[in-house]
UniProtKB/Swiss-Prot annotation:
It comes from the Bacteria. The keyword Coiled coil does not apply. GO terms for biological process: tRNA methylation; tRNA wobble uridine modification. Gene3D superfamilies: FAD/NAD(P)-binding domain, GidA associated domain, C-terminal subdomain, tRNA uridine 5-carboxymethylaminomethyl modification enzyme MnmG/GidA. The keyword Transferase does not apply. This is tRNA uridine 5-carboxymethylaminomethyl modification enzyme MnmG. It is found in: Cytoplasm. Its cofactor is FAD. FAD binds at G11, A12, G13, H14, A15, G16, V123, S178, Q367. Homodimer. Heterotetramer of two MnmE and two MnmG subunits.
Length: 625
């Protein structure tokens, strides 16, 4: 008897688990198929979650009802807030994960989720009828039928591990690769590219001389990614910092001809922002040293991840490199680093919902779309799961805009601009950074998560209470006038401010650069009555009000452009006035509105003006008809 589901998810990595959970939580009967049930949410590369931009994505996933934040909050060994000396737009959390505990906790969550079924199996083929996906077929011939399919295969598609002059078929960490499914996607007509990533050696902690390294402790205050977390892990493990040196670089130089990167064995394009150590040596040969972070992989293992030493050099050369590094001279290498090549699809073949343009009800998410990183994968998986379930159940799909979330920036970049290298999310990619902050992810997205059925009534009530407290406190400070008495003047001068000439509203005093919410309470001789996150919002929203309002005005302009819809089936070849390059790019991307069209590389303002004229005169509809 053939089993039938609403949604099937292929893969159970960081994209797959979020896709499966989101689909199930929206009420869709969901099947998750994975090559190995023991490797759900496996971390084949760095044992960490978060960092610049990425940490904000994890908060956004949580605000929308996803899982990654809750799981890392329960299983981390260290957590730090980055960029605390900078403005709120670039602050982000980063956690070191206990990679085994993270897997176990995520597997438990998946197994307990209603509507979500898990099965070990390798999908070889999609079942397609009339350009619409109808299910999948495994390598042993079992068929599972469904109304939608989400592919989240990570680096498994035609994966090949490269180490020195050796190259062999493999998924990450020497798991089985997925070869036949990649062939199937090619046969269906998808444009496929070849990308590469890599991982460093792991060493035995007992053999490291930590006295020669610099300790990197976690924060000594409770931190969490999830807005629901109330219990914090304060018993943390440190990381350690060391450096390469001239000796290390000589080993690399002497053996560069053995690197698959430079021997011609690697054909795939590697990540720009996470280069191998040999690539760093060649590209930045003026630098006398490179940072290496020693990151424990968990509480119950001696394996330490040498971040910054990603390499495809032969194993014996990796040992030689380690012997030159302070603290690692006698380190016992437990796993060698390696490079891995894999297939990815050209992401401009997707709609912003992550549904493929070619095959109806087929979605892709994660590294198959050309991204790098667990967080980028999880964000895409969440949205693919939300949209696949929403489409088959007719409960609505959701497209995040560039002003809604970093996840929106990520997906828009992929489907509008494409990528010719593994895509990494950076704060610099977001034009509305001040709106897309770590601290306000819940204020931006919890309403949306609730509307999608991903947020519980209890959580939504707590969120609304927080929002009301923020608004009430801003109003209260706007009504309090502070007098320029000696008590006030002394506190202001103590904190480097200039004396008041007249009375001032508390909210206006808070706007001064040197003032904080704590100082305002000190002047008012009041105790803390609100949660720290409420106080933080009051301070940030007050201090940055002018800049935030400017950003919101820019967003409104773009929204007006987004409201100018373009028919999906528009035949651009019939619009004679368009430049040839613009016609080709518009035909490839098929933008849904004028705003998206304006972001396509090769489409200039003159082309947008022509589209606007056609739109305003009603010609676009006639061209599409």
């Amino acid at each position: 008897m053939v089993q039938e589901y609403d949604v099937i998810v292929i893969g159970a990595g960081h994209a797959g688990v979020e896709a499966g959970l989101a689909s199930a939580r929206r009420g869709a009967k969901t099947l998750m198929l994975t090559i190995n049930l023991d490797n759900i949410a496996f971390m084949p590369c760095n044992p960490s979650v978060g960092g610049p931009a990425k940490g904000i994505v994890v908060r956004e996933i949580d605000a929308l009802g996803g899982q990654m934040a809750k799981t890392i909050d329960k299983t981390h060994i260290q957590m730090r807030m980055l960029n605390t000396g900078k403005g709120p737009a670039v602050r982000a959390l980063r956690a070191q994960a206990d990679k085994v505990l993270y897997q176990q906790e995520m597997k438990r969550v998946i197994e307990d989720e209603e509507n979500l079924h898990i099965m070990q199996g390798m999908v070889d083929e999609l079942i397609i009828e009339d350009n619409e996906v109808k299910g999948v077929r495994t390598n042993i011939g079992t068929e599972y039928l469904s109304k939608a399919v989400i592919i989240t295969t990570g680096t498994f598609l035609r994966g090949e591990i490269i180490l020195g002059n050796m190259k062999y078929s493999s998924g990450p960490n020497h798991q089985l690769p997925s070869i036949t499914l990649s062939d199937n996607l090619r046969e269906l007509g998808f444009d496929i590219v070849r990308f590469k990533t890599g991982t460093p050696p792991r060493v035995n902690s007992k053999t490291i001389d930590y006295s020669k390294t610099e300790i990197q402790p976690g924060d000594d205050v409770g931190r969490a990614f999830s807005f629901e977390t109330t219990e914090y892990i304060l018993d943390q493990l440190p990381c350690w910092l060391t450096y390469t040196n001239a000796e290390t670089h000589k080993v690399i130089d002497d053996n560069l001809h053995l690197s698959a990167m430079y021997s011609g064995m690697i054909k795939g394009t590697g990540p720009r922002y996470c280069p191998s150590i040999e690539d760093k040596f060649v590209r930045f040969n003026d630098k006398p040293r490179h940072q290496l972070f020693l990151e424990p992989e968990g509480r119950n293992t001696n394996e330490v991840y040498v971040q910054g030493l990603s390499t495809s050099l032969p194993e014996h050369v990796q040992r030689q490199m380690l012997e030159t590094i302070p603290g690692l001279e006698k380190a016992d290498m437990m796993r060698a680093g390696y490079a891995i090549e894999y297939d990815a699809i050209v992401p401009t073949q997707l709609w912003p919902t992550l549904e493929t343009k070619m095959i109806k009800n087929l979605y892709t998410a994660g590294q198959i779309n050309g991204t790098s990183g667990y967080e980028e994968a999880a964000g895409q998986g969440l949205m693919a799961g939300i949209n696949a379930a929403g489409k088959v159940l007719n409960t609505g799909e959701k497209i995040l805009s560039r002003s809604d979330a970093y996840i929106g920036v990520l997906i828009d970049d992929l489907v509008t601009k494409g990528t010719n290298e593994p895509y990494r999310l950076l704060t610099s990619r977001a034009e509305y950074r001040l709106l897309l902050r770590h601290d306000n992810a819940d204020l931006r997205l919890t309403d949306m998560g609730y509307e999608l059925g991903m947020i519980s009534e209890e959580r939504y009530a707590r969120f609304n209470e927080k929002r009301q407290q923020i608004d009430a406190e801003i109003k209260r400070l706007s009504d309090i006038r502070i007098k320029p008495n000696e008590h006030t003047q002394a506190i202001i001068e103590q904190h480097g401010g200039s004396r008041l000439k007249d009375g001032i509203l508390a909210i206006d005093l808070l706007r001064r650069p040197e003032m904080t919410y704590d100082i305002i309470l000190e002047i008012l001789e009041e105790e803390h009555q609100l949660n720290a996150d409420v106080e933080e919002q009051v301070e940030i929203q007050t201090k940055y009000e002018g800049y935030i309002n400017k950003s919101l005005q820019q967003v409104e302009k773009v929204k007006r452009m987004e409201e100018k819809k373009i028919p999906e089936d528009l035949d651009y070849s019939k619009i004679d006035s368009l430049a040839t390059e613009a016609r080709e790019k518009l035909s490839e991307v098929k933008p849904l509105n004028i705003a998206q069209a304006s972001r396509i590389s090769g489409v200039n303002p003159a082309d947008i003006s022509i589209l606007l004229i056609y739109l305003e005169q009603g010609k676009l509809q006639r061209v599409s008809d």
